[in-house]
């Protein structure tokens, strides 16, 4: 017999992502419509351990769907990964009668969700990260907004770069996953895209590409560099010294996490939030909501965390950039040894 859920909690954990508020709103409204009570856990797993719990109703999520960030606040919590921290969290859940939990975050957040499920709290995860780096899903809450924010900023930088006939290096977020860099590189028409999954450190190839472009009459050269490669300022100095072309680095930073979520992030996050409540009501636990091959589905969290994900060769190749393509082939050669 499925466990009857009467009170659910919702928390956001790890890095914030635009669309978390629409997801929270959907969780609260769907749960209340099904006759459930909802508790909001502030500051992620820190708040769960420290009993920072609030009652939530439809009024508490009014006027938040268009807001960036998370009204529940978020944090990373090392204590929760300890046995003592998990014990405290379980006691807080018991105190408030929380028998179901929706966790919005990334891989680390889902490992925490597994611990809650082990403690007897039915738990459902929603993929909330701007990095698009969760292997089981083609969509993560916040990516669409983040990549559009970055694209618009790069368009503006490109305007001034062309006016001054500069080379510009734009560093975007993505420590281990280069999806923002890849998508912006294609959407902004960059000459080079440097991805953690692909780049082999060959700056000379980039320099040669810049010089070749200038000989052909190009008035600018745009390089999109993922955070995982970094060192954009030093790279700019070296490129300018080698080419004699004025080169500037811009690090977009945390602006990519902020801002009003796009229509897609509002819509998909809302569907995922509602889906999570449906799973809890059905007695499901330790599941991760995903969007795969055009459908909203759910996976066992253990299975989802064991999956791997890599940059699509097709998406990478349609950019038609010789330097970037060289990096791709080098990566594939190394992988096949």
Predicted regions and their residues:
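N-terminal phosphate-binding or glycine-rich loops at protein starts, especially the Walker A/P-loop
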Residues: 3-49
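Short Gly/Thr/Asp-enriched flexible loops that form oxyanion-binding sites at enzyme active sites
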Residues: 23-27, 108-121, 181
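Conserved small/polar residues in nucleotide/adenosyl-binding loops
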Residues: 326-333
